[in-house]
C-alpha cells in the first residue's frame, strides 16, 4: 500500500514530492537530494516512541535514559566501557551548531554519577576549539608543564591520604588538557583537508556550522575518538514565525543538513571506517501529522507540534542491516501500529553493537547497580546485519 506523505497538512504536502529511491525503494523527500545517495546504507526506525513531550526532559531521556537530571549520558557510558584509543584526545567529544545549546543543557553530555573523566568535552568549530585551553600571555609550554607537574604532585599526595577517585580524575584532566593544547587545534583545523572534501561536505572554514561539525566528526573518528556527538539547534518548526515554518525555515534546515550528512556516510565508507563506526540520527521526539495553529486565526505560517507517539530515527554503519525499514504508523503517521521501539530499545541496540550486554553493563551508585536502560530495553534485532 502506498504510505507516502501524510495527508494531515493538506496543501503544504501537495507542494512536496516524495520518491522511492535506491535498491531498497525507501521514500525520500525531494528536499533531501543528497540523502538519496545513502538511502541504501541506512536502517529506518519508523515507530520510535517516547513518553516525554517537552524539549528539556525529552532530550535528557534520549541521552541519559531518564527524564530526570543526574544520570550519565550515553557518551559517558560508552567512554566508561570502552575507554579512549587516543591518549592525546578526549574519548567523548561534543560539537554544537544552530546558534543555541540543547534545551537540556550540558546534562546531555554530562557524566552524572560516573567519574568526571567520562564527561563529554565541548569543542567549537569557530575560535578556540576548547574554551580556556590556550595559555595566558607569559606562560609557555615549559612553564605550563612544570605547573601541572607541581599541581599533580600535590594531588597525588591528596589521593594517597584520602583515596578519592575524583582526585585521580583531576590529575588525568590536567594532563589531558596539556596534551590537548597541541592535539585539538590540529584535529579541529579543516583547512588541511583537500578542496574536494570541502566541496563534498559544503564546509566553510572559520564558521560554526553543522557541515563543519560533520567533517570534524570524521576527523575525530579517524584519530580514535570513541564517541562524537553532534547537536544542531533550530528544528522546532511550530510555525509561529517564518523561521519556524515548514515552508521556509524548516526547508532551510533540510538543505543545511542534507549534503553534510550524506558526505559523512560516504566519506566514512570510502575510508573503510563505516563498517567500524555506528552513526545514529534523530531527535528527542517527532512532530504531529496535522498542522499546528499556534498563533490563531489568520496565521500565515505552517507548523507542527511535538509528538512523542511516533517518529523516525535511522542508523547506519557497523552491524546495521542496510536499506531496511522497521516499524509502521497508522495512515496519518500519528501513532505506531507495528514494530514500536522505545528510547530504551535504541540504547540497548547501540550498546549491543558496541559490544555490551545492556543488562549487565552497570555502575554501582548509592548502594545499587544502575544501567543506561534502567529496567527496560530490548535489542532491535530486526535491523542488525
Model-derived regions: residue spans:
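Ligand-binding pockets and gating/stacking loops
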Residues: 1, 7-385
